[in-house]
UniProtKB/Swiss-Prot annotation:
Cofactor dependency: Mg(2+); Mn(2+)
Presence of the UniProt keyword Ligase in the record: yes
Entry coiled-coil feature ranges: none
GO CC aspect terms: cytosol
Binding site for Zn(2+): 414, 417, 432, 438
Organism of this sequence: Chlorobium limicola (strain DSM 245 / NBRC 103803 / 6330)
Name of the featured protein: DNA ligase
Substrates-to-products reaction catalysed: NAD(+) + (deoxyribonucleotide)n-3'-hydroxyl + 5'-phospho-(deoxyribonucleotide)m = (deoxyribonucleotide)n+m + AMP + beta-nicotinamide D-nucleotide
PANTHER family: CHROMOSOME TRANSMISSION FIDELITY FACTOR 18, DNA LIGASE
Length: 673
């Protein structure tokens, strides 16, 4: 095929692929299978590899990802991206409606309509299109400036790389540069798929956290694999300044954007109340998370006249649905065994509908929590779900009073290996001491070792680990590196191809960094931050292994408790046997070349995060501090340089204020990056 023919075929494939993207992500009416779509994309990628000069910025092949981004530069928004005022009260919604009408009447303007839209629980972004082509995508940041994440946003199939030609031609000549604002979110099914197979401690709490963390990943190929969606909720920069907001939403749909479709023009207050009431239940049937309703004045040309406070506009408000609760019966309690031997009680509930799904289980955390709640088997309990995947029991129902309720008894023996349980002094949890032989602990250690933040062996999921442990093929992570195809192929859902993929993934884990190996070992109290401190203080594994307790305790962020835990870990014969296997397998036993530093904005500073961050996943924010020369610590002292306080910050914030340690919010933290 000559160049001219290739150019024609590339153009045809691009048009066809984008048409199917639109039908799938915007219209929700696919006409071909995923396999057929993948074949079209493969054909395009193959042709572009043969003719790299024909690759353009709007090619659908860019959605596959693969680019590694060292950092995300800051960009200033054309106009501030203000957050909306929130309310959980219908009375405050009515007050907002009347206040806007009164302000307009004072200006001599008659009654105006409102637009009600579903509030998507995601991450706000801004997209800039120049001459119909996507040129920039940025996070909201502090509202004034955000991070340029264009390379990651290009992987989202519901974001047009080029605006739909037929609709874009209706824009005037002055519309050469427009801005589209909206929300990136992760559909429920894709979120469940992302969490599936991850160990408990490595799972995302909710789709919003997963989205925020994914958008800041440096590997765009991984971003593409996680399948997020974009919903557009405002169009700025068009020539017709008097185009109502409702009409702008319609135009966004014609330009190729998903707009959610569930929005309504509301002339009167009762129309708003009806919309909110309708969607309080209907929202659970949607394939994505919505947590409220946004109300905006339809007359966009009046927004500037109404103005804004320092934080939010006066022409819009967000009504948020309250946390969902249900009352059901506690049927029983099962006891799970974690990788460190911790016994966790889990409530088995009479199935009840809650937040759009059937709930039959809830964590009880520990036995002190059971005592605090005063809960017994066969009690009627109040279960709440608010943004998290796992619901929680918040209290015993007032009308419980069952004559048949019985106390929850602490088990005497491990439910996995039947070893007598122990409870260390000053701890709330019970433990199984059979570390080497308990199947549940072995399973947990294997999953932790293979998890994303450890050795990242993606082919090693829960079902496969259960088979490997159950058949005695592995007793610790060191056994992974001696697995052979004949051992793997007979396993359920494996076969030759899957077995080869697993062996390849295990081989690739040998190249992971020394600090990740230290974290993957699963030493009690040694998280990712502590593993990095240890790797920095002891760049050779042999020196760490030989270090004394007092010496370890003097390492920053270690202290006597962690030091004792490290010494105890290395003193166990089964641990030594595992380490010998890992060393023989060629795992990194010393630190490699240090990661390149982005800048020195946190040079020499010890930083701690407390509370929930709105725009970052905690581990991603901590990594940003390290990339800029800072050090993450786990407790507040007079030596702490900076405390970044998010929502519902607790005792660490109080201690910082008492000690006079500098405290900043998420906005100021982003500005420091």
């Amino acid at each position: 095929m000559d160049r001219a023919m290739a150019a024609d075929e590339i153009a045809r494939l691009r048009k066809e692929i984008e048409r199917h993207n639109y039908l799938y992500y915007v219209e929700a009416e696919p006409v071909i299978s995923d396999y057929e779509f993948d074949r079209l994309l493969e054909q395009l990628i193959a042709l572009e590899r043969l003719h790299p000069d024909l690759v353009t910025p709007d090619s659908p092949s860019l959605r596959v990802g693969g680019q590694i981004t060292r950092s995300f530069p800051s960009v200033r928004h054309r106009e501030p991206m203000l957050s909306l005022s929130n309310t959980y009260s219908m009375e405050e919604v009515a007050d907002f409606y009347r206040r806007v009408r009164r302000l307009l009447l004072d200006e001599g303007i008659g009654e105006q309509e409102m637009v009600a839209e579903l509030k998507f629980d995601g991450v706000a972004v801004s997209l800039i299109y120049r001459n119909g082509l996507l040129v920039q995508g940025a996070t909201r940041g502090d509202g004034v400036q955000g991070d340029d994440i264009t390379v990651n946003l290009r992987t989202i199939s519901s974001i047009p790389l080029r605006l739909e030609t037929s609709a874009s031609e209706t824009l005037s000549g002055s519309d050469r540069e427009i801005e589209v604002r909206g929300e990136v979110f992760m559909p429920k099914e894709d979120f469940d798929r992302l969490n599936e197979g991850r160990p408990e401690e490595d799972r995302f709490a909710n789709p919003r956290n997963a989205t925020a963390g994914t958008l800041k990943l440096q590997d765009s190929a991984e971003v593409a694999r996680r399948r997020m969606t974009f919903v557009a909720y405002f169009l700025k920069g068009i020539g017709d300044q008097h185009m109502p907001h409702f009409d702008r939403l319609k135009l966004l749909g014609k330009l190729g954007f998903f707009t959610g479709d569930h929005y309504r023009l509301c002339p009167e207050l009762h129309d708003i109340e009806r919309f909110i009431g309708e969607w309080s239940e209907k929202r659970w049937k949607l394939p994505y998370e919505t947590d409220g309703v946004v109300l905006k004045l339809n007359a966009v040309w009046l927004w500037e006249r109404l103005g804004a406070t320092s934080k939010s506009p006066r022409w819009a408000i967000a009504y948020k649905y309250p946390a969902q609760q249900a009352i059901t019966e506690l049927l029983g309690v099962v006891f799970q065994v974690g990788r460190l031997g911790t016994i966790t009680p889990v409530a088995e509930l009479r199935p009840v509908k809650l937040a759009g799904s059937t709930v039959s289980r809830s964590t009880l955390h520990n036995f002190d929590e059971i005592e605090r709640l005063g809960v017994r088997v066969h009690d009627r309990v109040v279960v709440e779900k608010s943004g998290e995947v796992i619901p929680k029991i918040i209290r015993v129902a007032e009308d419980s009073g069952s004559l048949f309720s019985v106390p929850i008894v602490v088990p005497e023996r491990c439910p996995s290996c039947d070893t007598p349980l122990t409870r260390p002094e000053n701890e709330v949890s019970w433990y199984c001491p059979n570390e080497e032989g308990c199947p549940a602990q072995i399973r947990g250690r294997m999953l932790h070792y293979a998890s994303r933040n450890a050795m990242d062996i993606q082919s090693l999921g829960i079902a496969l680990v259960d088979q490997l442990v159950g058949r005695g093929l592995v007793k610790d992570p060191g056994d992974l590196y001696s697995l052979q195809l004949p051992q793997l192929e007979p396993l359920e859902r494996m076969g030759t191809k899957s077995s080869i993929n697993l062996v390849r993934a295990i081989e690739e884990s040998r190249t992971k960094s020394y600090d990740r190996l230290l974290y993957a070992l699963g030493i009690r109290h040694v998280g990712q931050a502590t593993a990095r401190e240890l790797a920095g203080a002891y760049p050779y594994f042999a020196s760490l292994h030989e270090a004394g307790e007092q010496e370890l305790a003097e390492v920053p962020d270690i202290g006597p408790v962690v030091a004792r835990s490290i010494i105890d870990f290395f003193s166990k014969p089964w641990v030594q046997a595992m380490l010998d296997k890992l060393e023989q397998a060629g795992l990194p036993m010393r630190a490699g070349k240090e990661k390149e530093q982005v800048n020195n904005n946190f040079e020499g500073q010890s930083v701690i995060f407390t509370g929930g961050l709105e725009r970052h996943v905690r581990q991603e924010a901590e990594e940003m501090v390290r990339e800029r020369g800072g050090r993450i610590v786990s407790s507040v002292s007079k030596k702490t340089s900076l405390v970044v306080a998010g929502k519902e910050a607790g005792s660490k914030l109080e201690r910082a204020l008492k000690l006079g340690v500098r405290v900043i919010g998420e906005d100021e933290f982003e500005a420091m990056l």
